[in-house]
Amino acid sequence: MLKLTYILCLVYILNGLSMDAQSLKIMTYNIRLDVPSDGENNWSNRKDFFSSQIQFYEPDIFGVQEAKPNQVTDIATALSQYNYLGIGRDGDGKGESSNIFYNKERFSVKETNTFWLSETPDIPSKGWDAAFNRVCTYALFKDLKTNKTFWVFNTHLDHMGEEAKTKGIQLILSKIKTLNSKNYPVIFMGDFNSEPNENRILELRSVMDDSKEVSEQKPYGPSGTFNNFKHDQPVTKLIDYIFISKNSDLKVKKYAVLSDAVDLKYPSDHLPIFVELKYK
């Protein structure tokens, strides 16, 4: 009887480990740049809660937007289990960046780069009618738990230029098509500064799956992601997304917008999106 109990326990543990290996937790997070004019919402007052939030949810990979060099350093120092990829929009170590942080024990990086959303994507540049330089950072990861390979693209589209937003998405999709000759699964995430009913998002949904729309479980949390640091108001403006390539080996099990706060203060003016994916 004891032997049977031992075997059953071992099977249960191994099954749990297998299920965990098949799961992939992804997060996108506009962390709000470090700017003194934010007053009580300055990064120095937010960074500890931000880091503790990441520690609690334990994403395997998370993409950030608006990260200034000092913020990237703070995150890397506080969350030493992650390595990060990506450079600033004004050049290496300059300006805001859209970094990809990944669990360094679970993943190896096969390929990575940062390009600019412009007519000259290989050099720091501002595209079309954009107000600022904008970038996309991407990486090809190998999951050391499963030996699966997949791409991650992380971006922050312009907040002003309508043409820049549309052509920025088109440029990224073109880059995905060029790079992904082996048809690996693709995760495309970030702050798109575009709401769900805008044509560019509708068109993107025709070629990739919006994780919110295809989640097996009912989406959790507020309907929007941009909170503007206003904890006393509903969050209804949705401008952040995680898209998954259609007909890929990844399925969306759970989707959530996380509205955690401490003392009625958010860790950013955006709420993060957290999804749990699973391999088919």
PLM region spans:
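N-terminal, active-site-proximal structural segment of metallo-dependent hydrolase catalytic domains
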Residues: 2, 6, 19-78, 89-96, ...
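Bacterial N-terminal signal peptides
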Residues: 6-16
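Acidic/histidine-rich helix-loop elements
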Residues: 28-48, 117-131, 158, 233
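Active-site neighborhood of phospho(di)ester-bond hydrolases with catalytic His/Asp-centered motifs
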Residues: 63-65, 86-87, 187-191, 210-213
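Metal-dependent phosphoester-hydrolase catalytic domains
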Residues: 163, 167, 177-186, 194-280
